[in-house]
Amino acid sequence: MKNKLLKHTLYICICIVISILIEVLYFNYNAIFNNIPSENIDFSTTTQDGNAVLNLNLDSQYINKLIINYDATKDIEYSLRYSSQDLFGEEKENIIKDIFDDSFNTSTTNIRNYVSKIAIEYASSEATNLNIRSLETDNDFQFNLTRAFSIFLVLILFYCLIVFYKNGFKTEKFHIYFAVVGTILGTIIILAQPSSTFYSYDDQIHFQNAVDLFSIGDTTYSVGEYHSTEANVANSAGRGSVNSIEEQQAQNNLFDSGSSTYSKTVKFAPTYNKIGYIPMSLGYHLAKFANLPFSICFKIGKFFNLLFYILLIAYTIKTIKIGKRLLAIIALLPTSIFLASEYSYDPAVFIGLTIFIAQLVNLYLDKNTKFDFKTAVILFASISYACFVKAIYVPFFLLTLLVPKEKFDTPKQARLVKAGTLALTILLSATFVLPTISGTMESDSRGGSTSVSGQLTSMLSHPTDYIKLLGNTAVAQFSDKVSQGFDDLSYIYNEAKRSSSNFFYILLILLLFVSITDNTGNSLSKKHRLSILIASLVTSLLIWTALYITFTPVGDNTINGVQSRYFLPLLFPLLICLQPKNIKNSINPRLYNTIILTIPVIINIITIFTSIVAVYSY
């Protein structure tokens, strides 16, 4: 035991040393060995096509960071264009979109390249709102603690994979492997991202709900809360303009500076659909109660959301009778880990529906599993948790009606459970249907000229036309929704300048391979497969319909607002239906488990470092 502890401690120390060496010798190579000085840069201003253009006077030279010192009376968008050589010596033009944020007076952009020319463009009409005081390069040595710690965590992650392999990489311990890998990957995301919103879907709304959940009475928002919620959605400091570790620090200094002038009265009204905010709200308010700076509180709220996701999915992987490894891979998709590390209630839906499906599958397959009180609580609580957040997943609850009668102690118990299932299904459906019919459900103004009552009237007046629209739209957009769903990092990709399909085919092949080969000898009957497929199809149609009602202009011939993440909870129930009865996996379990877990780990690391760490923490 002592030898193992000593060995692990030694490797951790080695990882620390290696991460420091990489940070110092690789990322600061030019500062140490080429001694390239930092300097002020002269520039000239011209106009072109209605834009003011700042041309920097420089020779072909290495620039690590470009610093623009300015004064702005409003947020002003600008483009930074620079020419550099690629690996083949060919000159290429690079374009970086950024903002002169009026909350700050310095913009720091990572170049990290030899450049021959740089031009900065912004609308000429904004000239009276902007004064460029000076431009300079920063080629000095910089020890970036966030980057170094991220590298350290990656080294620890690979060491864990080595330890798992040496210990046999046992299938029955896959929940532990998932928990370790998921926690490390999510932690890197949380640490590297700025402590603000507008990086994942609607996170400013989710963060505000998390802040308000445990707030009662007259509440004054802190500066960070004010800039990170819907309260100041139009002019949030740092929104879309944090592109370096220096700008992160400037934003943190502002957000940690105390209270804002914005206050509101928060009434304690615990509605059922707020249940998904409890983990992140609890973490945030505990940190706030401890008087920690906003930038730290913000990350702790995210970490609680991640931890809740990891613990419950790990529990599900441990207890489910089939598809352990398949569930782990789905839960480790870049989209899954990213959303679990954000202010988002999408993980709540995934957790609730996955636990429900796992418990139901155990009832279908395991002869020793009875429908006892514990099983009933897990089933009813998990599906309610998912549907309280988003009621459109309620069709899955009807699968409880297919539990074999021999699972119940008495016929009376079976009748009570089925009656309770129908009653709760109606109740959960009512949380969505009644507000829609009564007109109390609000449409989403972001969709344009939307109206719930108006859209319903249009649909009921032209039911055949809507059915055609629904079918045509779902079929036409199916491939896009699938291809965008595996490694979609929301608004992060706008900053990283890349699409969300870089690893789609690798992940698709991996998921199909694991769904077919993760076979323990048990598989669902045709009846159960068909029922799950029908529930998935009905839920998918409800997703499209819900967005047509709430997010699409009345009478429009398309359906707006449907995003791939809404279908992520359906992935596991759909793929377990593909598990064959007659195919036996003869691959060595240790080798098989190593391969299928290492692939998503590598993809996540590449995705996180190229799209998050390199964009926000360099």
Summary of predicted features, one role per range:
Residues 1-32, 142-189, 417-424, 524-532, ...:
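Start-transfer (signal-anchor) and selected internal transmembrane alpha helices
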Residues 13-34, 172-203, 211-251, 422-439, ...:
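Transmembrane signal-anchor helices characteristic of membrane glycosylation enzymes that use polyprenol
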Residues 163-164, 299-322:
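Transmembrane-helix motifs of polytopic, lipid-linked glycan transferases
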Residues 216-300:
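Interfacial juxtamembrane loops and adjacent helix segments
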Residues 256-260, 433-519, 618:
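Membrane-lumen/periplasm interface segments of multi-pass, membrane-embedded glycan/lipid transferases
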Residues 292-295, 314-335:
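Transmembrane-helix signature of polytopic, membrane-embedded enzymes
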Residues 338, 374-391, 396-402:
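Membrane-interface alpha helices of multi-pass inner-membrane proteins
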Residues 359-368, 394-426:
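Perimembrane helix-loop-helix junctions
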